[in-house]
From Swiss-Prot:
It is found in: Host endoplasmic reticulum membrane. Residues 1-30 are cytoplasmic. Down-regulates MHC-I expression by impairing the appropriate configuration or presentation into the plasma membrane of the latter. Participates in viral hemadsorption, which may help viral spread. Reduces the transactivating activity of host TP53, thus inhibiting apoptosis. Non-essential for virus growth in swine macrophage cell cultures. It holds the Pfam family UL45. Induction: Expressed in the early phase of the viral replicative cycle. Expressed in the late phase of the viral replicative cycle. This is Lectin-like protein EP153R. One of its GO terms (cellular component) is host cell endoplasmic reticulum membrane. SUPFAM superfamilies: C-type lectin-like.
Length: 153
């Protein structure tokens, strides 16, 4: 039957063909599978032991951080930009940011650069001041003006 089959394979030193039966073929398959599993296990163990070498941010020793959905990560801070139809006055914007466990973003150079990258077509509330359209400037505004806003955390 099936186990009685013989296969021609491997050549001996005298260049004569050897005949392999099913059991020797299966043994060779088991050996190859064992070698593959063994090398995978060694690789996994090595990676587990030396994992710290793989997770590094080399620029300024930054640490990895994650932001919630709809937030933008920049310089280890998460920012929420309100969209075009979602403008509020200063007090309402500040309260909304608190509901998101954040505050109105502080006005600094990093945020100014981010607004130029992210969206330079609007004015945003940030910490009781406003980032002007497309300019590298801040301007004081009255608190009741409805504008877009940026939360940070």
């Amino acid at each position: 039957m099936y186990f009685k089959k013989k296969y021609i394979g491997l050549i001996d030193k005298n260049c004569e063909k050897k005949i392999l039966d099913d059991s020797s073929t299966i043994k060779i398959c088991y050996i190859l599978i064992g070698i593959l599993i063994g090398t995978n296990m060694i690789t996994l163990i090595y990676n587990f032991i030396f994992w710290d070498n793989y997770i590094k941010c080399y620029r300024n020793n930054d640490k990895m951080f994650y932001c919630p959905n709809d937030w933008v990560g920049y310089n280890n801070i998460c920012y929420y930009f309100s969209n075009g139809s979602f403008s509020k006055n200063y007090t309402a914007a500040s309260n909304f940011c608190r509901q998101l466990n954040g505050t109105l973003a502080n006005n600094d150079t990093n945020l100014l650069n981010l607004t130029k990258i992210y969206n330079n077509q609007s004015m945003y509330w940030v910490n009781n001041t406003v980032i002007l359209r497309g300019d590298n400037k801040y301007s004081q505004k009255v608190n009741y003006t409805d504008l877009l806003f940026i939360c940070g955390k």
